Amino acid sequence: MTKKPENPGSAGIRVLKTRIKKKSGLKESSRRWLQRHINDPYVQRSKADGYRSRAAYKLIEIDDKHHLLKPGMKVIDLGAAPGGWCQVAAARTKSTAENPHVVGIDYLEMDAVPGAPVLLMDFLDPDAPQKLAEALGGNPDVVLSDMAAPTTGHKRTDHIRTMHLCEVAADFALSVLKPGGHFLAKTFQGGAENELLSMLKKNFRSVHHVKPPASRDESVELYLLAKDFKGREAGPPSGGSERPVDVSKDLSARSDSEGPGDAEG
């Protein structure tokens, strides 16, 4: 199991603290964010381990505890860029280029992930489910989403925007998952999710929040974990059958690619 680094060198890497000078020309908030990012032990570990982002360790830690990913399972990663979660899922499902078990989807271009093809399109496009099923060779056992809306600094607004992404991801998962499948998605603390929780509890046998050690202590970030999908006979998604008006292209962003003031990576 991956443990939270106690210090920057706990992963076997000798790291020197880096300080960004106040006269660097950056705004103070940007300077603080950059300094924290550079000195983050998960960022340093991700470089040493070959992961594209520190967010990879969030999925590793959640999977170590909750056992979502197993060899041969089919997985869809929504908003896959830059590819850290695809890397983890591909390794744990034993996905290969010849026999892919993991497919990512994102309208943002990204480098190819070995063993995990990525479709360059919006997952809300009408033909996305069919194209994903074709790429996987069937419906998924797991749907993942680490999407978050770029933050505005207004906590209530940020929560609502990211919750909307979580809701449309959940509706997508309900439309494609195999019975017994699992759904994992980023959300923020802050309420306004009773309808989503009610819908998930109606359609999955286990629903709860998780916060992996790789999520910063001060972050409002949480993950919704819904396990053991009951199947589509349990009832249609509530309130999510209609496509929102162009919100995903305005809001969707893999949080680990954001800069100062944005969601945690």
From Swiss-Prot:
Entry keyword set: Cytoplasm, Methyltransferase, rRNA processing, S-adenosyl-L-methionine, Transferase
The EC number(s) this enzyme carries: 2.1.1.166
GO cellular component term of the entry, any: cytoplasm
Chief site of localization: cytoplasm
Top-level EC class as recorded in UniProt: transferase
Protein location: Cytoplasm
Top-rank taxon: Bacteria
Gene3D superfamilies: Vaccinia Virus protein VP39
Feature: compositional bias, Basic and acidic residues: 243-257
Active-site residues, Swiss-Prot/TrEMBL: K186
Gene Ontology MF annotations: rRNA (uridine-2'-O-)-methyltransferase activity
Coiled coil: none
Binding-site positions, S-adenosyl-L-methionine: G83, W85, D106, D122, D146
Span list, region Disordered: 230-265
Pfam families (alphabetical): FtsJ
Catalysed conversion reaction: uridine(2552) in 23S rRNA + S-adenosyl-L-methionine = 2'-O-methyluridine(2552) in 23S rRNA + S-adenosyl-L-homocysteine + H(+)
Disulfide-bonded cysteines: none
Task of the protein: Specifically methylates the uridine in position 2552 of 23S rRNA at the 2'-O position of the ribose in the fully assembled 50S ribosomal subunit.
Alphabetized PANTHER family for the sequence: RIBOSOMAL RNA METHYLTRANSFERASE (PTHR10920), RRNA METHYLTRANSFERASE 2, MITOCHONDRIAL (PTHR10920:SF18)
Family (UniProt): Belongs to the class I-like SAM-binding methyltransferase superfamily. RNA methyltransferase RlmE family.
Annotated protein name in UniProt: Ribosomal RNA large subunit methyltransferase E
